[in-house]
Amino acid sequence: MSILTARELGHAFGAAELFHDVSVSLERRDRVGLVGPNGVGKTTLLLALAGLLEPTAGRVDRAEGLSLGYLRQEAVLTFAGRENSVYQEMLTVFAGLREQEAHMAALEATLAESYSPELLEAYGRAQEQFEREGGYQYQVEIKHVLLGLGFAADQWDTPLLHLSGGQKTRVLLGRLLLEKPALLILDEPTNHLDIAAVEWLEGTLRRWDGTLIIVSHDRYFLDRVVNRVWELAPAA
């Protein structure tokens, strides 16, 4: 069953038509590389598929409840006004687990002052849920992703406001990888990565359990990751 279907999509800026009559569909675990010459409208098509831009023709249908993550080529505006550090931004992905953690700490404090079998049972249930949902692993995941994307440990406390545009894009990529959306759309994800980080990302995406759409000028990277290719041609 398709998680996304686009029918007869077209987009124009004034009289300048980028593309027309684009029809595609995505199944779960598809890994699609979107290719085409510069200026053909690849980014515009990604925005339309992600629901971030209304195409001038056609329609896009997405599965109900589909979680979607989108990596822009530049993420400067994504973090405008945010005062988090690099590590704190990663922690936002796990807000639910952190609330559970705080609840468990409160139960522990109460148990230390006034023990009761009922309270101990409640703590046991909370601990089981926390473990089941990955509560004892999420900080390990964060460290793995940050190191993989080239952030040394001494950079994790750096405020987002002090990062370069390329570093902010890497932070956004890391956050998306931790969020694990069902559909992950990546526009030139290797642009701000060194060779080691590109290789790490390649391995991560090859193991990805969701659906991918990737635009990349690195055809070797695409060949290693995707199992389908969409080619966008200039509008006639």
Name what the model sees in each region.
Residues M1-A236:
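ABC ATP-binding cassette signature C-motif
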